Every structure is written in C-alpha cells, then in structure tokens.
Amino acid sequence: MNIQALLSEKVSQAMIAAGAPADCEPQVRQSAKVQFGDYQANGMMAVAKKLGMAPRQLAEQVLTHLDLSGIASKVEIAGPGFINIFLEPAFLAEQVQQALASERLGVSQPTRQTIVVDYSAPNVAKEMHVGHLRSTIIGDAAVRTLEFLGHHVIRANHVGDWGTQFGMLIAWLEKQQQENAGDMALADLEGFYRDAKKHYDEDEAFAERARNYVVKLQSGDTYFREMWRKLVDITMTQNQITYDRLNVTLTRDDVMGESLYNPMLPGIVADLKAKGLAVESEGATVVFLDEFKNKEGDPMGVIIQKKDGGYLYTTTDIACAKYRYETLHADRVLYYIDSRQHQHLMQAWTIVRKAGYVPDSVPLEHHMFGMMLGKDGKPFKTRAGGTVKLADLLDEALERARRLVAEKNPDMSADELEKLANAVGIGAVKYADLSKNRTTDYIFDWDNMLAFEGNTAPYMQYAYTRVLSVFRKADIDEQALASAPVIISEDREAQLAARLLQFEETLTVVAREGTPHVMCAYLYDVAGLFSGFYEHCPILSAENDAVRNSRLKLAQLTAKTLKLGLDTLGIETVERM
C-alpha cells in the first residue's frame, strides 16, 4: 500500500474539481513534524499562482471537494496554503492487518520493466580494492530493491578484460615459463603485473613482443585466447570469493566484459561516419560535440578510433549502450560508476542518442558516487600509502567484529560467534557506506561503523533482535495472532504504524533514485519509533489481551519490515546478539 500515492490521487481530483488544470501536481509529502500531520499537500502555491488566486483560498476550495472519509481523521490548512492530513487510527489499523497478511508486507508491484544495472566492474589480473566497494554494494542494493518490486533485472559486471596489458601479461608469463596460469593465485598475478609493467617500460624487445601478442590476441589466435581466458578465470574465481563474503548477488554469469563489445566496434565507427557524426581529424576518427566545449569554446572532439586503428573506452561504451537496448531489450539502464567518469559517460551517451542507437524513452542514468576517505579526509590508503585490498579490509572487519561480539557474548559457542561476527563485521562495512548519500564522499571510520548506537549496522541488527525478544519472552504462537484485531489508540502506536506503512514509499524512492541511504534512514527511524513505543506502551503487561495482541502485531510488523528492509540492502539479520 502506497498511502502517498493514494492521497496524491485524492488531492489531485479535488484540485481539478476546484478549477486547477488536469496536470496539476498536488505535491503530497510525508510530514517532517508530527504537528503537521502524517502527510502534507504543498502543491497549492504553484497552482494558485497560475490561477491568479491566493494559495490559502485555493486550499479552502480544494477542501470542499476533498473526500478522505475513512482515511483521515483531520484535514487542516496551515500557513499560506499547506494542507495537513492526519490519518484515521482505524485506517492505520486496517492497513497494518493487510500488511501482516501479505508476504510482501502489502507492497504493490509496479509495471514490470527490464532494467540493466552496471556495477562493480573490477579489472582482470588485479585484486579488488576499496575503490570497488561503493559501486559493488550500492549497485547490489539497487538490484535487490528493483527485483523485490518485481522488475526483470539484468546484472552487468562490466569487467576490464581487454587491452594492451594482456599482451604484456602473457609475454611475461611465457618468459617465466608459467604457461599453466590456472594454478596461480591472484596474489601471484598482482606481482606478475608489476614485473611485467617494469619489463615493458625498461626492455624494448619485451615491449615489442608484448605488442605483437596483443595483435595476435585481438586477431583470435587460439593459444593467446586460451592464455587470456585463464587470466580472466583466475581473476573472476577470486572476485567471486569477495562477492560471496560481501553477500552480494553477482555471479560469474553476470560478467559482461569489455571484450564482449569488440566485434561491434568497427561497425559502429563505420556507421557514425556514414551518418556524418564522425570525421577524420589528424589521422584519428573523431565526433565533435556542440554540447561540450573545449577551453577555446569550440565543440569538443571525442576520439572513437586512434590513428593506429585502436579503439577507446568511449567506443566501447557506445557499443555497450547499443547492446543493452537492442540485445538485452532494456527499458532503463543504471550505471554505478564513480563521479569522475561523468563527462566521459555523458559524451558517449550524447553520441548514442544522436546516432539513434537508444531512444530518448529509455533512460541511461549515471548513479554516480563520491570517494571513500580516511579520517584525515584524504583517499583511504594503507599506512604505507598503498591501495587497500578489499579482502584485507573485510578480514579486518571480521577481526574487529569478532572481538566485539566475543566481549558481549562470553558464553556463545565458537560457531555461533563466527556467524555473528561475520554478520556484524561485513554488515558494518556495507551499512556505513549505504547509509551515506552516495553522491558525497564519506569518512571511513571503524569506531563509528561498529558502534551499537546511531545509524549503524550493529544498532539496526540489535534493534531487530530486540523486537524478536518480545516474542521469545512471551512464547507466543505468531499464527494464533493472525485473527486478533489491531487497535490504535495511543499516539505512539499511531506514529509507529504510520511509519511502518511508508515502507513501499521508501522502496519506490530507492528504486527511482538509486539511493539506499533513504532506506537506511527509514529503518533507523522505524527502530527509534519502536523503541519509544516499547518504552511507553507496555506489550506483555498491557491492560488486557486485546491491547496486548494488537501491540504484538505492531511489533511483528516492525520485525518483518526491519528484516525485509535490511535484506534489500544486503545486510544480514541475526536472531540474537
């Protein structure tokens, strides 16, 4: 149930009846403060201006046409023309009953779309590092949310699996007589990469051989293709371990590397030339875009093929967007790539639109994100100034969480302790990131993320176990509760119920904007409201069975909402902490 959508429809009809245009926006929002009701319609200002009347006068006329019987207990005009809506307790009670009767907690399903989500995108022959964390976990939270809403989601792991470095790596492996690359661990490959690069820079004969190997690889030579495939396989096997540790839904089947688009590139360059979009300039093939200017104020040239015939990332990204529309039949494409790539993507997509490869009706959305910073406000590094490997970060998270939970649970079995430490440690790293607005940089701080107070994973996981403990203490049969009515008579009951019923609205925002922090803020709010409700509205010692059962049902919906909400974020819940 989307109460915001229901009220928007009702207010919109009343506005039209009061003389507003048919496309008027009621601007129904969740109220920021309790005294302004549960919802507020703010659309009178803009519409009244068009109609040449005072907003308050329009609001008064709208109220004469607004029928919210059975939904609102009170509707009032505030300030210059805001309409405050207070929900009817009986309506809240009925919606809570319906949410509990549904596995989906009453969340409706929008029109099903095919949505391609591009995220994670590590490089072959390199271990994943902290720079891959944000794309991987924010993208996965978006995927989980979209899938829960019923969309057909195609995960696209745009792996960097092509380029001159492969000639270099294969040449170096050969030189070291390590052709059986399948037996190597990725840590070896990292060392090989460094050594190969050093030789490539210092040994011209080696560099020449590496360049020849690239040509052979690109021409489809069987031996070189096999060596390349081994490098890719080793990398993705290692990355899968990281994905599984992170509780991320990516698998090998989701890999759509840069190499996938190679066969398309010559045709795209030829087509862009034929369409008059690409021209020869100083030996290269270039698309000049009026939408982007260089320092001199002239249209910026975007190279799609170099003098030597090589292609660029832009060419691949043009092919990639085309493929996602034509072959994957995407209705919408989301890219979780850091903000530094924004202009590059905008240029590629401008060419895509001009060439007619993807119609304007199919959104291409760059859901960019900021950087992960250390406490000093600089990019997060090791003490020695190197890049932090993702596996090392997760190891440290697990170790810190292990100490934390062992201290709080001295009698817990080793197995249970390990499971709990894993849920808390990995959850803490993910939640610390997901709870921040993705568009901003954020400070990585172990102490904050592992705290049991504030908007953190440990606090949210504990809040969930606290609700469950109510049922454990009372030894209640949840099935027997099903027929008991919900009675909303206290303000704290109403506030908790109203917020719980905004779960669908929250999911809708996350799905539309790709902003998991909105879900984190919502769940944190729910946990806080439950805490106040638990303190002031006795559950197990309620004055009678009817009130006790009703409050148990509110607790039940709280637990289900917290669990499902955390699941859309990829955060594991535990039964006890």
Swiss-Prot record:
According to its UniProt entry, the protein's GO biological process terms are: arginyl-tRNA aminoacylation
Q: Name one Pfam family in it.
A: Arg_tRNA_synt_N
Q: What class of enzyme is it?
A: ligase
The highest taxon in the source lineage is Bacteria
The enzyme's E.C. designation: 6.1.1.19
Where would you find this protein in the cell?
Cytoplasm
InterPro entries named among the record's database cross-references: aa-tRNA-synth_I_CS, Arg-tRNA-ligase, Arg-tRNA-synth_N, Arg-tRNA-synth_N_sf, ArgRS_core, DALR_anticod-bd, Rossmann-like_a/b/a_fold, tRNAsynth_Ia_anticodon-bd
Q: Where is this motif: 'HIGH' region?
A: 122-132
Q: Name one GO molecular function term.
A: ATP binding
The UniProt entry's GO CC annotations, sorted and at most eight, read: cytoplasm
**Which family is it part of?**
Belongs to the class-I aminoacyl-tRNA synthetase family.
The protein's name: Arginine--tRNA ligase
Origin species, per record, is: Salmonella dublin (strain CT_02021853)
